[in-house]
């Protein structure tokens, strides 16, 4: 049995995620690590309860606990590197309000590597926890991380602006940072959904286009230069240009990949397997190379390939600042890029166009591995004469000779299978997507009938 997926532990409250589990994870972290642990939480209704259980587990092992309380995940990672030997974040990121979860960080701000997560699971399942003597149990110390974190981002970005920016915080923890960061940069900030509320009353927390499409109209009505949207724990960023057009996540990645490769005169960019061909096109043209890695492991890719930049959809890592996903650095650098090079609508014209479609197929967790394998094998047979490369990390990514690709992978956080297709034309994309989606849907039904 696995507790950790591609983004830590995540699941529905009381079904998978409970105070008992949080306490055991805390006990396991305190057994695996020693010294100080920085603990934070997002704004979900269950996060205070789970944070307190986590703290109890950590204290029981003798660790000293620093309580950052309500904080965005990137700020928790930064604070861990500055203050502690380990970090723990109570969050379910962009999941529905019924869910919650746990992310664990090393003292350098990296998320726990897969082998470390397996180590925690072994400790939890064995019950072999360290138990502190009565005189080893330390008091909890409350710490304020956010002001110093904002200053660190400001220093790193090193730019002042007079842009007008619309910010949508998804009623999440990012609302404690982004409006203040942008204002300190000199921007005129207009905010929506910027009060923290674990019910997520403004919109669904995931910043997919369908959840934030209304921002395009607001951009045009308010005359802003840029709109930024985040998720519940503020590790994701989505953007609209000054004309109200949504800038898809691969284009944002491609803009930054191009920037870093040009600055370095080459270098390696690591991206997750669900990213598109436009990234390869701009990186190779600029003299760099792209390496695709499993989902949830950009920090591992940075270390393994000495990467100058890493990204997943909506999640960008700026290694010079830190080895964690940091959208606050992203928004600061994006504003700098716009000020120095022109409107975002013009910048994206430098990125080649590919057409992407994605959807989820509901699938019970126990069938996901079989369904993904069978569906990928069937799609490979149908496209055998066109295949350029097949990557079998975090699922199956089937790349074709014309630059098209199909991805079939199990979700690491939900009972779903992700299906993605991208191609140079909409017609080709639709053909590939329909083939993959219908194949996965049929095999799920067959598996459920067994």
Swiss-Prot record:
Domain of life where this protein originates: Archaea
Top-level EC class: isomerase
Pfam family for this entry, one: PGM_PMM_II
Temperature and activity: Optimum temperature is 90 degrees Celsius.
Record-listed E.C. numbers: 5.4.2.7
Active-site annotation: 93 (phosphoserine intermediate)
Role played: Catalyzes the conversion of deoxyribose 1-phosphate to deoxyribose 5-phosphate. Also shows weak activity with glucose 1-phosphate and mannose 1-phosphate. Could be involved in pentose biosynthesis.
Listed name of the protein: Phosphopentomutase
Organism of origin: Thermococcus kodakarensis (strain ATCC BAA-918 / JCM 12380 / KOD1) (Pyrococcus kodakaraensis (strain KOD1))
